[in-house]
Amino acid sequence: MSAAVTISIDAMGGDAAPDMVVEGVRMAHERLPHVRYLMFGDASRIEPLLARFPEIRGVCTIHHTEESVSMEAKPSQVLRQGRKSSMWLAVEAVQKGEAAGIVSAGNTGALMAVSKFVLRMLPGIDRPAIAGMFPTVKGETLMLDLGANVDCNSNNLVEFAVMGEVYARAVLGLEKPSIGLLNVGSEDMKGNDAVKAAAAALRDSHLPISFYGFVEGNDICGGTVDVVVTDGFTGNIALKTAEGTVKLYSTFLKEGFQSSLLAKFGYLFARHAINKVKVRTDPRRYNGAMFLGLNGIAVKSHGGTDAFGFANAVGVAVELVTHGYNDRIRKEFDRLKPAEVSPSQLAAGTR
């Protein structure tokens, strides 16, 4: 039997909150019956929803607050005025040790700002990174950063590589995950100074990383490497492009099979294969972006997801807790200290 885990939930975060959030917790409970939830939000709206799902009433504790963070709120505004919001209180529960991780479908910028302010960074890490899974022809690939840091230096990229490598080993169970740096070409002379310096640091360092080298955009879904490292500007564009491509592909298929009576008849034969493809590319299955590098587990669900997607985000948080991701990151960076060369010193030396 799995050990009990407590997750704090920003019940008011997301386009369809709190309905989507509570139903998502119900779906997560079916797969993760050992998890308990601290739900932060408006009790007058959450209680009726829990009454609809009595099977989770016993594992949910409501912490009432009437304040929430809007999707339009600026992070700086939330840091000044949002300390009684459902998002802030949910993050604070992790900092106080009341919960092992927090999940929110709310404002991404605000969640990152609040998480950094309340949880702080793990020792030895300069910046957090948003990480997520991409479907590939070979399975899945972890990619980071997906939007936390628009500008990155070589030090940041090296740290992201270490965090991604530890995640791939600890959570994905890969014995020796391969790491690739996203670039405009695979040749050594291509790319900006930060990318080239990070590549040199990873190649020449004592770090226990299987560095593949540079990868290009088409390598992400090709499954060329297990972990793709990039800055948040490029990573977020890649993520949104992939999401848009899936929607475009689905639209083309729908239009094609509705174009004629013969096409509709053909769909009957192809339906099973098409549904398998839809399942593999369903963005809800990969919902749950991880804020790696924080001194606490924080997972961001897509704001427009449904209950199924939110349940998957909860699952991501539980996996991080269960596999002791943050403890492993601490040990990894502590282990680097005796060599008297930290990732930041390595990258700085190549700039």
Swiss-Prot record:
GO terms for molecular function: phosphate:acyl-[acyl carrier protein] acyltransferase activity. Its EC number is 2.3.1.274. Disulfide bonds: none annotated. Signal peptide: none annotated. InterPro entries: FA_synthesis, Phospholipid_synth_PlsX-like. Pathway: Lipid metabolism; phospholipid metabolism. Its main location: cytoplasm. It is an enzyme of class 2 (transferase). It catalyses: a fatty acyl-[ACP] + phosphate = an acyl phosphate + holo-[ACP]. SUPFAM superfamilies: Isocitrate/Isopropylmalate dehydrogenase-like. The keyword Cytoplasm applies. It is found in: Cytoplasm. GO terms for biological process: fatty acid biosynthetic process; phospholipid biosynthetic process. Keywords: Cytoplasm, Lipid biosynthesis, Lipid metabolism, Phospholipid biosynthesis, Phospholipid metabolism, Transferase. One of its GO terms (cellular component) is cytoplasm. Belongs to the PlsX family. Catalyzes the reversible formation of acyl-phosphate (acyl-PO(4)) from acyl-[acyl-carrier-protein] (acyl-ACP). This enzyme utilizes acyl-ACP as fatty acyl donor, but not acyl-CoA. Homodimer. Probably interacts with PlsY. This is Phosphate acyltransferase. It comes from Paramagnetospirillum magneticum (strain ATCC 700264 / AMB-1).
